[in-house]
Amino acid sequence: MPLKKNARALPVPPPPERRRFRRRLLTWYRRHGRDLPWRKTDDPYHILVSEIMLQQTQVDRVLPKYAEWLLKYPSMDVLAAAPEREVTETWYPLGYNIRPRRLQSIARESVAKYGSQLPSDEATLLTFKGIGAYTAGAIRSFAFRERAAILDTNVARVLFRVFVAKGDPKSHAMRRHLWTLSETLVPMRHVFDFNQALMDFGAMICVARNPKCLICPMKKSCRAYPFDAPISHRGHSGHGG
């Protein structure tokens, strides 16, 4: 769950800057967003499967396994009843084999306690072992279309570069601030598109190495532009426009 204590030690962008960021991001996404199968469903189980699979695994490796998995385990009930060894074998070769066990554990708890459904509220989602703050936010915004923030590696990198660009991006204090930024930026409408856009932007434009700054729609206001040195050594000088 996002930690809010002392999270506002760093300033959040004023409303005009937030609106400008949302507008530019959504415009870019509608032109360049990836066409992915889990974006064509609002089934909470399907969203859960995609989010667990995408942890530590590239999209192109997940795509065929996602389709295979849902063909074999089309519902929480089917997954909950499946033999554990079979579930692990079906997961191969995605790796990190704790993930299929946690996914099946979530399915079993959902069947036992919630009528084979995932709950939509954050507090209950966070009681499931294997669902953290990011996954809970993804389920709430992608499956239930609720106004919920997300913060994974890609999103954190985008927000840090565009709005901060100084300090240690991996510190606990910065992580709290980036959660606050994400919560502040989430729009009242188009939450699904906005959060998907953030992830795509971090995966396609604001990448970890050699980001595509020259074609970036945020370059006029990005605090890190142009990104040509370790971010922790850069300040706002000349790039806060």
Label each PLM-derived region with a short phrase:
Residues 2, 10-17, 24, 28-231:
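Catalytic cores of DNA base-excision repair glycosylases
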Residues 233-240:
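Short, low-complexity, charge-dense intrinsically disordered segments
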